[in-house]
């Protein structure tokens, strides 16, 4: 099983705006140093209110990943996950392309239907009903795939119309950067995973729930003739638990790996993210042995 580090907290004691960049840089370097496979961040204008407050600091995700790309060499980079409403899909595909080029082929598109209504209303970003957000999500996936292909023609959807899908330079990864869809909605989200995605990200509530979601995804794959084994199953976990009880954490991961999970993202990396990441280093080889 692989490890990913999810950087979601910009509120650290004594860290003002002028020190956020250096701290992010050192955390990313530490993550790569311990053997993390992924480095991800959130895609929000405001900090999540279930985690802190809307007035706590939050940096724009893709700008931040471009910064991280310049100081790392190996880790895959993406947002967990991009809200489909935040950027026009043509622009989003161009942003991912740029990140892929500048990182020498390490970008992936993590995307979902968006949910944080307050930040949309605050900054004047349209926030349609859930049904329409899922329609826009599917069209965005189609547009991204077209822009990462040789097809430079038009795109005509119910919500988005593009006259030309020119995208130069092309992405480094072939045939395209991986697409990850976040969430475990059984009727729509997991169906879109089966149709369009290379990976999904599930919340690690418990092994039974994750196992059920995976079985639903398998059924969607069977219905459309998709090879389920092509899809990378990832999940979110908690770094504090992993550090405090590594043996218990690894036992949990063995159960998830048996279900098909191949990467765990550890979030909530605390007031000293560099130290928190380094504390995870002994887990990495033991985690890698699971499912090997």
PLM ranges: what are they?
Residues 3-7, 39-41, 76-79, 107-111, ...:
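Hydrophobic faces of well-ordered beta-strands that scaffold small-molecule active sites
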Residues 9-22, 80-90, 175-185, 236-247:
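Active-site mouth loops of central-metabolism enzymes
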Residues 34, 102, 195-196, 259:
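Structural motif
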Residues 1-71, 175-177, 269, 274, ...:
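N-terminal beta1-alpha1-beta2 module of alpha/beta enzyme domains
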Residues 31, 43, 68, 99, ...:
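Conserved, mostly hydrophobic/aromatic
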Residues 18-31, 92-95, 182-195, 243-257:
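Short, acidic/polar
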Residues 7, 30-32, 37, 131-173, ...:
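An alpha-helical appendage that flanks or caps ligand/catalytic pockets
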Residues 2-20, 82-154, 208-209, 269-271:
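Flexible, glycine-rich active-site loops centered on histidine and acidic residues
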């Amino acid at each position: 099983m692989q490890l990913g580090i999810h950087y979601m907290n910009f509120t650290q004691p004594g860290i003002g705006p002028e020190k956020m960049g250096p701290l992010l840089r050192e955390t990313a370097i530490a993550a790569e140093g311990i053997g993390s496979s992924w480095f991800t961040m959130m895609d929000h204008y405001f900090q999540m209110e279930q985690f802190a407050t809307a007035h706590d600091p939050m940096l724009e995700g893709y700008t931040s990943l471009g910064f991280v790309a310049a100081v790392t060499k190996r880790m895959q980079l993406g947002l967990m996950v991009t809200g489909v409403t935040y950027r026009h899909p043509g622009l989003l595909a161009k942003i991912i392309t740029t990140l892929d080029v500048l990182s020498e082929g390490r970008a992936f598109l993590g995307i979902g239907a968006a949910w944080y209504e307050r930040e949309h209303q605050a900054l004047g970003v349209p926030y349609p009903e859930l049904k329409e957000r899922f329609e826009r999500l599917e069209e965005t996936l189609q547009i991204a795939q077209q822009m990462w292909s040789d097809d430079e023609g038009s795109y005509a959807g119910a919500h988005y119309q593009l006259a030309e899908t020119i995208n130069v330079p092309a992405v480094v990864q072939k045939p395209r950067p991986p697409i990850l869809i976040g969430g475990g909605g059984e009727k729509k989200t997991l169906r879109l995973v089966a149709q369009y995605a290379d990976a999904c990200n599930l919340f690690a509530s418990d092994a039974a729930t994750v196992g059920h979601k995976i079985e639903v995804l398998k059924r969607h794959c069977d219905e459309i003739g998709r090879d389920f084994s092509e899809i990378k199953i990832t999940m979110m976990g908690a770094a504090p638990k992993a550090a405090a009880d590594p043996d218990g954490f690894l036992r949990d991961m063995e159960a998830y790996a048996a279900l098909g999970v191949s990467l765990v993202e550890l979030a909530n990396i605390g007031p000293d993210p560099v130290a928190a990441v380094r504390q995870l280093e002994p887990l990495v080889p033991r985690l890698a042995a699971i499912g090997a």
